[in-house]
Amino acid sequence: MNCAILVSGDVKYTRRLLDSAFFREIDGFAIAGMVASAPDAQALTRARNLHVPTFVVEEKLFPNGTSYGVALLNKLKDIDSDFVVADGMAPVPACVAKHFGGRLLRVKLNPVGQTMEITAYLSDAAGCVGEVLGEATAALESTDTQESFTRRVYDLAEGLIVDAVESCCGA
């Protein structure tokens, strides 16, 4: 499976996935490239360090969201992506969601009281939650700082992403 990772800033949920690809830990999985919406996205440096091809489709250069979406979709096609992981890019342009419906992996965070519900899912063609591939919950602990809680949430999300990709590769 040839996967592209979409980012808008830093890597949030795909550090472990990048490492898994680098060390070839998932059979049949390769990262075709990381595509960022801005040239200064910190995620690009991490990807380059792991020998992942990087690309920029700079959103601010386009007159509207539709033309940006078409350019992004064309880049994903150019690098032969057959699966996409959206890491912190929201919203994903409608034409990308439509083209990759059922093959666009996203993470949804839902705060509920003193917990954070984390869901990894395949987006449908309308860009909505489709098939749920994994769920986890992080409870706020009395010793947590904002940073430690956020890191724990991201760690859980990273695990869900890797598990979801493994599941999709095995399907």
Please report, for each region that a protein language model flagged, where it lies by residue.
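One-carbon transfer enzymes
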Residues: M1-A171
